[in-house]
Amino acid sequence: MPVVTLPDGSRREFDHPVTLLQVAEAIGPGLAKAALAGRVDGRLVDLSHRIEADAEVALVTARDADGVEVIRHSTAHLLAQAVKALYPKAQVTIGPVIQDGFYYDFSYERPFTPEDLEAIEAKMHELAAQALPVERRTMPREEAIAYFRSLGEAYKAEIIEAIPRGEVISLYSQGDFTDLCRGPHVPDTGRLNAFKLMKIAGAYWRGDSRNEMLQRIYGTAWGDRKDLAAYLQRLEEAERRDHRKLGKALDLFHMQEEAPGMVFWHPKGWILWQEIEQYMRRVFRDNGYQEIRTPLVVARTLWERSGHWEKFSDEMFTTASEERDYAIKPMNCPCHVQVYNQGLKSYRDLPLRLAEFGSCHRNELSGALHGLMRVRGFTQDDAHIFCTEEQIQDEVSRFIDLLFKVYADFGFSEVQIKLSTRPEKRVGSDEVWDKAEHALETALNAKGLAWDLQPGEGAFYGPKIEFSLKDCLDRVWQCGTIQVDFSMPDRLGATYVAEDGARHVPVMLHRAILGSLERFVGILTEHYAGQYPLWLAPVQAVVLNITDRQADYAREVAQEFVSKGFRVIADLRNEKVGFKIREHSMQRVPYLLIVGDKEVEAGSVSLRTRDGKDHGSFGIGDLVAKFTEETMKRAVSH
């Protein structure tokens, strides 16, 4: 008879096979009421799952991440049930869990409208209130295909036909609705009470543009209404911070149909972009990197030798000239190897760090483009380190220190780290992989950093570490990476003369801290809601005169700051000073320097910040010193 071991180490003995729900009931009525699913020997299963042998068991509630995932999966089924109830001719396809929610794709004779979305959500609440039991059953493969065909659900039948023979076909039913699913699911629809449908979008069946366009309904679901309300509030704040809106409002950039996925930088936006580039250029210079520049258009033959043509040719922009095929480079690494290959290299030359603000282009699908976050033309703070196997750990350690310093300077303190190790298909010996993985792991552990292991998620050419920023809305952005490459230097003929006089192939470390500069501008803009710290602000201060009598003095003050290297302008328009203050505050200018007759006489300015606070009178020299200190410290106030 089964003995159940709980997470706290305690044991429960039963004299007969039991379900997970019965285990929960044996522990207490509160847990039985709260339980949604459970893990049996690590596998997530329904509460109806029978335990017939000794097992380790953990009950899952809405407070657990697993519980929220089960809720979202079950809410996707609830959505499909509501759609079928309201629109019987609609066909259901797939409905997975995604970050913060779920979606379900439907085939229907007409587009769903916002009014339809409201009706569907209302129907979902109605079905949830009925607390319909959710029941699992299995069915033979051919019988399941025939069952869904009899319902007119051709997509479901096609999905089952693609499932390998021998796999269990499980169905879940609630009320008069049945869906194909592995599960697990909540025990009844009454557990689903914190959800909202978000939007409708198009999606091709199986993600193939040659197939039918389906209608995708997105939704979100949470463990309780409080979490749902908090999420919706975060969405509202994210909407307010949307870099596309702020880009227009602050006159930073625009994009247009004639160049999809390409950025038209305006003067203010280009200042911001250049400040980031110049900062990273100093980082390169101060940390032993040599900056290079490589061609934008390179012959197909190089991409074939590097292996990129075989894997990425669909994502390349190509052209031809004089009977030769060319590609606009989608990445910089093969070109960096060409620079390395010029001249004989010795072990004394290593590590060799080559950096480039490399302009790259990738032919992303138009539907995937999203402002600055997903573009076709972008610039990377790209660098490649050529080193020996013995130097990997030290170079990775140096890079990690540098990355955290850079992120801190931009105002990011929370960084998530993932280490990805060898996949099944890979190049290089196990011995070399052992060394590389050990070097990355040791470098992380030596700094006391928390990190997650992703077994098998490394590239075919080597293991990697990924670094993701967490912004003020707790969103995670993967920006930094360092990847070990055993393949490309060999493919492209890179060698060095070792201490023994023989030629060896160097290891190549691909590394970036910010990634795409365009994307990083988008991240910064949303993180700060356009209120950039002084050192990054396109306009750092505006001098405002109250009347025409102070115009000449206002010009002199602005020029004094400009001569010290600050981006300061004078607004001498014949407008009320209150109007000018509001306008420049809305433009997120960090400092407003107001001058009236009193300030002219004293040789000072009255200082206001964009948050509306009055900081009193400052002499010009004192304020220049304040700006200098704040810029040097890269303070993130205001």
From Swiss-Prot:
Enzyme Commission no: 6.1.1.3
Cofactor dependency: Zn(2+)
Protein name as catalogued: Threonine--tRNA ligase
Function: Catalyzes the attachment of threonine to tRNA(Thr) in a two-step reaction: L-threonine is first activated by ATP to form Thr-AMP and then transferred to the acceptor end of tRNA(Thr). Also edits incorrectly charged L-seryl-tRNA(Thr).
Positions of the TGS domain: 1-61
Start and end residues of each stretch annotated as Catalytic: 242-533
Assembly notes: Homodimer.
Domain of life assignment: Bacteria
Catalytic activity reported: tRNA(Thr) + L-threonine + ATP = L-threonyl-tRNA(Thr) + AMP + diphosphate + H(+)
Cofactor annotation comment: Binds 1 zinc ion per subunit.
GO molecular function: ATP binding; metal ion binding; threonine-tRNA ligase activity; tRNA binding
Record PROSITE patterns: AA_TRNA_LIGASE_II, TGS
Principal subcellular localization: cytoplasm
Residues that coordinate or bind Zn(2+): C333, H384, H510
Entry-linked InterPro entries: aa-tRNA-synt_IIb, aa-tRNA-synth_II, aa-tRNA-synth_II/BPL/LPL, Anticodon-bd, Anticodon-bd_dom_sf, Beta-grasp_dom_sf, TGS, TGS-like
GO CC annotation: cytosol
Family designation: Belongs to the class-II aminoacyl-tRNA synthetase family.
HAMAP family tied to this protein: Thr_tRNA_synth
Species annotation: Methylococcus capsulatus (strain ATCC 33009 / NCIMB 11132 / Bath)
